[in-house]
Amino acid sequence: MSKVIETNLSYPIGQYQQHPFSIDKKVEWMADIKFLPLQLENAVLNLDESQLHVPYREGGWTIQQVVHHVADSHMNAYIRFKVGLTEDNPTIKPYNEKLWAEFSDVQKLPINISLTLLHALHLRWYETLKYVTDEQWNNRTVFHPEHKKTMRLWYLLGLYAWHGKHHVAHVNSLRERMGWK
């Protein structure tokens, strides 16, 4: 597979791009967080069990793994935000997403478990985000020990808004390539 095609399959909406703080971006990214569960649910709508076990690209996760991964990732994100809002530059806990994707809950449980979790989680997350002040977006930080990097909550908001759209695009691009209506 050519490097360009592989990159497009891995990053169908491109890689995350940082943006300076703006009210317009804040509104956009918060809407992305709010509506991600519905968008992901629509992306997997009417897929059968065999389709859920197709990887979105060669060597990539299956659709089932993607859905459960988004739930795992966004649970971590929600906690990272709350810790970042209540502690001074806390060190966040990394996790091995590749190993998490191999756990039995990901392999065996139906995706509606994670979709339901995402609907509830994103309601709580969005409610929390509505009350983050502009000063907090720019000044509250967390430290990521694997990347050895301090990250503003503003950066994380954009990253996780992108992350959700990124995985919805994985599902939608596979559906399109496979001709699944």
Language-model regions: role of each:
Residues W29, L52, G59, Q107, ...:
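Residue-level recognition of alpha-helical structural elements
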Residues K25, D32, E58, H69-S73, ...:
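Alpha-helix N-cap/loop-to-helix boundary motif
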Residues A31-A43, A101-N138:
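Acidic/histidine-rich alpha-helical segments that form the ligand environment
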Residues V27, A31-K34, Q64, H68, ...:
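A generic "alpha-helical surface" signal
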Residues M1-Q17, L52-K98, Y126-E127, N138-K181:
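Short, contiguous alpha-helical
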